[in-house]
């Protein structure tokens, strides 16, 4: 939630019924494009799978905003060859389900600074006194658990109960009591990825790991792996 839960305030005096309302529906950033088109009297193209917010503006019930979908690929050049950490997630009122497509990669970047463009360990986390402290005392009682959450590997699936664990500290995925919830959210997420033709699901070319990197490079010889010829 720290990366994706952002308040949204909208003002449109002539287009919002009963202004001043607080809406708890989930909004994806991509929903803004069809909203602007609809507001301008235009029909969103069929390629747009996001949903307009106009029904919410008009104080009508909407079935299209009951969950938020989140995605991540490469954030920083902190793995060998410029590889990212691909994951997709679905956030509902009660749960957060995350699917990590490459669980053998370091989510916060490699601990080996020589494979990081900026020559720092765990490059997804910027240098700071807090990071330095956690790295230096990561084996100390009271710090080890936090350090593992910050720097450690993650399983292929994560599931958090936001009512009992709002800070998402305890991964429930794989436990019997939440098996049905996990399966339901997994299906909803993967159905959405199929609808949006996400290549991580459809089997098409996945080029995100091979995109050029435009950040600072301090490590001599560091570069992004070239795109495989089969994907040209």
Can you annotate each of these PLM segments?
Residues 17-18, 77, 105-106, 168-169:
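Flexible loop/turn segments at secondary-structure boundaries
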Residues 136-157, 162-232:
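Long, internal low-complexity/basic segments
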């Amino acid at each position: 939630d720290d990366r994706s839960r952002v308040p949204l305030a909208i003002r449109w005096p002539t287009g919002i019924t009963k202004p001043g309302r607080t809406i708890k529906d989930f909004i994806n950033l991509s929903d803004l494009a069809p909203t602007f088109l609809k507001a301008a009297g235009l029909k969103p193209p069929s390629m747009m799978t996001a949903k307009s917010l106009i029904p919410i503006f008009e104080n009508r019930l909407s079935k299209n905003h009951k969950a938020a979908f989140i995605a991540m690929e490469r954030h920083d050049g902190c793995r060998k060859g410029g590889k990212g950490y691909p994951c997709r997630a679905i956030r509902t009122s009660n749960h957060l389900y995350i699917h990590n497509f490459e669980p053998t990669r370091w989510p916060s970047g490699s601990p080996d600074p020589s494979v990081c463009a900026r020559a720092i360990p765990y490059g997804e986390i910027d240098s700071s006194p807090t990071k330095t402290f956690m790295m230096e005392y990561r084996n100390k009682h009271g710090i080890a658990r936090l350090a593992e959450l910050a720097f450690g590997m993650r399983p292929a699936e994560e599931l958090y109960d936001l009512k009992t664990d709002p800070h998402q500290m305890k991964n429930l995925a794989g436990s019997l009591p939440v098996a049905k919830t996990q399966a339901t959210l997994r299906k909803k997420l993967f159905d959405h990825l199929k609808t949006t033709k996400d290549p991580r699901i459809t089997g098409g070319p996945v080029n995100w790991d091979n995109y050029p990197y435009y950040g600072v490079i301090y490590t001599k010889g560091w570069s992004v792996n070239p795109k495989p010829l089969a994907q040209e």
